[in-house]
Amino acid sequence: MTSTMTQGLERIPDQMGYLVMSEDGGVLASAGDLENDERLAGVIREMVAVACSFRDLGDQQPFKRMSIVFGEHTFLVTISGQKIYVVKRQNVVREPISV
């Protein structure tokens, strides 16, 4: 059974797993490759804290999203409603278009 907090995450194409965290980094929900991954939650929380600190340096745009791209997968991080949503998504390699 999915909760309203995670129902949209489960429908993301090529999704390999997800974490929903509180602002302090506590895991509220998880599934797939990221199920109960407290270590990754801590790392992501630190990265979010650093990204949020840029606002103090004069950047007026609030931090909302961050992508961490690796060769075969990407972590998509979004802050919404005092929660941090992390989705691990498989990168789909596409052939270049010839024109």
From Swiss-Prot:
Alphabetical UniProt keywords: Lysosome, Phosphoprotein
Gene Ontology CC entries for this record: lysosomal membrane; lysosome; Ragulator complex
Highest taxon in the source lineage: Eukaryota
Subcellular location: Lysosome
GO BP annotations, alphabetical order: cellular response to amino acid stimulus; positive regulation of TOR signaling; positive regulation of TORC1 signaling; protein localization to lysosome; regulation of cell size
Quaternary structure and partners: Part of the Ragulator complex composed of lamtor1, lamtor2, lamtor3, lamtor4 and lamtor5. The Ragulator complex interacts with slc38a9; the probable amino acid sensor. Component of the lysosomal folliculin complex (LFC).
Function: As part of the Ragulator complex it is involved in amino acid sensing and activation of mTORC1, a signaling complex promoting cell growth in response to growth factors, energy levels, and amino acids. Activated by amino acids through a mechanism involving the lysosomal V-ATPase, the Ragulator plays a dual role for the small GTPases Rag (RagA/RRAGA, RagB/RRAGB, RagC/RRAGC and/or RagD/RRAGD): it (1) acts as a guanine nucleotide exchange factor (GEF), activating the small GTPases Rag and (2) mediates recruitment of Rag GTPases to the lysosome membrane.
Similarity section: Belongs to the LAMTOR4 family.
Name by which UniProt lists this protein: Ragulator complex protein LAMTOR4
